[in-house]
Amino acid sequence: MSEMTPRKIVKELNKYIIGQNNAKRAVAIALRNRWRRMQLNSELRNEITPKNILMIGPTGVGKTEIARRLAKLANAPFIKVEATKFTEVGYVGKEVDSIIRDLTDLAIKMIRLQIIKKNKKHAKKRAEERILKILIPVPKDNWNEENLKEKPEKTIQIFRKKLQEGKLDNKEIEIQIAATPIGIEIMSPPGMEELTNQLQSLFQNLSGKKKNLRKLKIKDAMKIIIEEEAAKLINLEELKEKAIYSVEQNSIVFIDEIDKICKHHSSASNSDVSREGVQRDLLPLIEGCTVSTKHGSVKTDHILFIASGAFQTSTPSDLIPELQGRLPIRVELNALTVDDFERILTEPNASITTQYKALIKTEGVDIIFTKKGIRKIAEASWKINESMENIGARRLYTVLEKLMEDISFNSNEKFGQKIYIDEKYVNLHLDKLIENEDLSRFIL
């Protein structure tokens, strides 16, 4: 992270997101400030809180993608939630505290995978010993590593070498493997997810750690045993401590559709009261409080919150003043143009056109998008967005799916062919779609 300067962060984001430079700069600075803060002494570090961000822009312009890619760059716990899913305390529905509980669960899984990866080499060695125990039997009552060493060294080395070289992969062995706990589905009322989790954990513990005798090929058994041995090397208390620390110091919470919980001036209904209640419940979470989770208490003082909304029927000033103050950095994202659509189709890593080409290539068909064909797809997508609901870059998926429908359906009949997606091909397949979209405006 020390090498990830704001300029480099923006460069990485440019690989996946087209345009929106102001938003990229804002999140890059926010992420770099996380690293800068961690270099300070503990007294000053605790005084510095993250500058939360409010992204304003229409749907499909890259708000969520920017936050998601940022979390991957930081290798930090990240959760995306929709503000409309939550209700004020006392109402039926999810409470905002569940955001932090879910985030902590994600951090536990993330740190667990990191520890397993770190211990994989040691776990593999232990897995080999378990398999060698079966291949070179010794009395069960007396089993230990010393017994294995007492066996002729030459025999052990021969089997170990064959095992490591994969020559025994298809040999079947019988092995004791921990049974998968029976999943018990409990339907809980909204807002009581924590109680459900506790009940599920209780039932799983009551079932005990049973083991099943299974007959498997050595290559399949090795994978399962490595996972088992790696799990045994995990210190649960240390895992929880690391996960909670990661949540408190590095995590990012992305709250989407925050404009939907704004109070509308034109109405004064109970729903507006509830919306304002959700905003007030979010206040302590964003400002900094302690949330109890099943893994321990989590302080939210240094979690970075990124909120976003289209604000088509409201403005950021419709949020309660206290919440506006907790989101000091405001970034406006621009609506996408035809040129943006053209770049989205070709420039990002694993662009949409690259994905379609790779999928159809599996059938032995080469798809070639010409420059004029790409331009026509971009123009068609932009035109439909302007005439209908503007869904931003997501419109490209609709258009391309329609465009590629015939090729996808008949690909087995076109084996070995090269198909050019040019202006003529696009006109032939998309003109009807555009006409239908235009007509639908006049139908009630």
UniProtKB/Swiss-Prot annotation:
GO terms for cellular component: HslUV protease complex. The keyword Cell inner membrane does not apply. It holds the Pfam family AAA_2. One of its GO terms (biological process) is protein unfolding. InterPro entries: AAA+_ATPase, ATP-dep_Clp_protease_ClpX, ATPase_AAA_core, Clp_ATPase_C, HslU, P-loop_NTPase. Keywords: ATP-binding, Chaperone, Cytoplasm, Nucleotide-binding. It is found in: Cytoplasm. One of its GO terms (molecular function) is peptidase activity. It comes from the Bacteria. ATP binds at I18, G60, V61, G62, K63, T64, E65, D256, E322, R394. ATPase subunit of a proteasome-like degradation complex; this subunit has chaperone activity. The binding of ATP and its subsequent hydrolysis by HslU are essential for unfolding of protein substrates subsequently hydrolyzed by HslV. HslU recognizes the N-terminal part of its protein substrates and unfolds these before they are guided to HslV for hydrolysis. A double ring-shaped homohexamer of HslV is capped on each side by a ring-shaped HslU homohexamer. The assembly of the HslU/HslV complex is dependent on binding of ATP. Belongs to the ClpX chaperone family. HslU subfamily. This is ATP-dependent protease ATPase subunit HslU. It comes from Buchnera aphidicola subsp. Cinara cedri (strain Cc). The gene is hslU.
